[in-house]
Amino acid sequence: VKALVKLKVISKKEALTIQKGLNSILNDNKKGRLKFSKKNEDIHMNVESFLNKKIGNVANKIHTGRSRNDQVATDTRLWTIKASKNLQEEIKNLMKSILNQARGNEKTIIPGFTHLQVAQPVSLAHHLIAYLEMFKRDLNYFDFCINNSDENVLGSAALAGSNYNLDISLLNKSLHFSKSKNNSMDGVSDRDFCMYFLHASSLTATHLSKLSSELILWSSNFMKLFNISSEYSTGSSIMPQKRNPDSLELVRSKTNSIRIKSIELSNIVSNLPLTYFKDFQEDKRIIFDCYDELISCIKIMEKVIKKSNFEKSIGRDLCNNYFATATDLADYLVIEKKIPFRDSYKIIADIVNYAQKKNKNLSQIKIDEYQKFQKSIDKNIYKYVDINNSLLRKKTPMSSNPKDVSRVIKKYIKFLRVR
């Protein structure tokens, strides 16, 4: 409307009338008063019809210089920017809940797993920070989505551009775009920004599914590392002793449909020559559904993390019972006894096999038993058996050493405060 005023296609008085009419239609829609007609083909023509009834023939001027093609492309870009920012806010809320669980647990021992086998001791905080890293990448991906959606398409018209000398800078400023399209044909046909949105959503969904699966596993009777809040678990209809992590299972299930949506839209747009087709009507359904499902999953996960608790004592027992410091013992032989690592590996493997047969953990094996496998072993080996020392011994900055974990936690506190 502002651009048409500048071109003197409509007067300032007519522009004010049009704006009041459009605001009235918006208010009617919020109150459910609008009755759409199939005779008007689509939402654009329905709105124009509503406006005509409210303000008369001046409504017939608003379509000057534009097409439904460039209008819907612009509207979709504006929606994608807003949706991406909303998702970023919910992801940050989830990250804050994860961070709050990590704080104070820099020295809380849990087993780190590979192949679902107890591998090495880590801290609960270190494990949770891994998810902060994932969700931080998701924030960055949505930044990428916002940047690629931030292109004004108005002026492309149907496909060839507009015959009216529209002030594109004015349009950009009015709609809060930082730039405009260079090519009108690409302007009306480009749905890459929708694909980026779906890809980013798919990646976030993947991380949510991963976290859900892990917490479900941790809440099982076999691990008991995670106690899910009763608000987000349900009882069995027949077995009174059970609590089921239904909320997490539903998040895990719903993330599958989110990930499929990027494939669905890709299949639609890959078959289309330039420029505009009715096929594009489907992109709204896909991205709207994706958004609704993803934001609900993030919100549920945030509440589950916030209101549940992690078991702080069982992790240590799991590490002891499943020889989690075996690698530390191999390093002991390398560092203190100068035995090549591959030879050290074999010696400790034999010791672990011996301990399993004797139903002992590594701290329960006596020094004379250790010396049966390597005579040079002395009492210093017990320093390497100790799980706390395993964390403290880590040297690299990305390690599970409590000092490094605390440093990273401080970084995330600052990151979430300023972002």
Residue map of PLM features:
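Short, well-ordered beta-strand elements within core beta-sheets of diverse protein domains
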Residues: V1-I10, S123-H126, F193-L203, D328-K338
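Charged, flexible cofactor/metal-binding loops and thiol motifs
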Residues: R77-I81, I110-P111, Q117-N271, K278, ...
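Glycine-rich cofactor/substrate-binding loops
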Residues: S49, K54-V58, F222, M239-R419
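A helix-coil-helix interface module used to build multimeric assemblies
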Residues: V1-G161, L166-N172, Y232-S236, D246-L250, ...
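A generic secondary-structure micro-motif detector
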Residues: S37, P121, G187, C319-N320, ...
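Short linear loop/turn motifs
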Residues: T17-K20, M185-D190, I347-I351, D386-N389
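Structural signal for hydrophobic packing residues in well-ordered secondary-structure cores
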Residues: L22-R33, L51, I55-A59, S84-I109, ...
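A generic structural-conservation signal
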Residues: K13-E14, P111, K181, R342-D343, ...
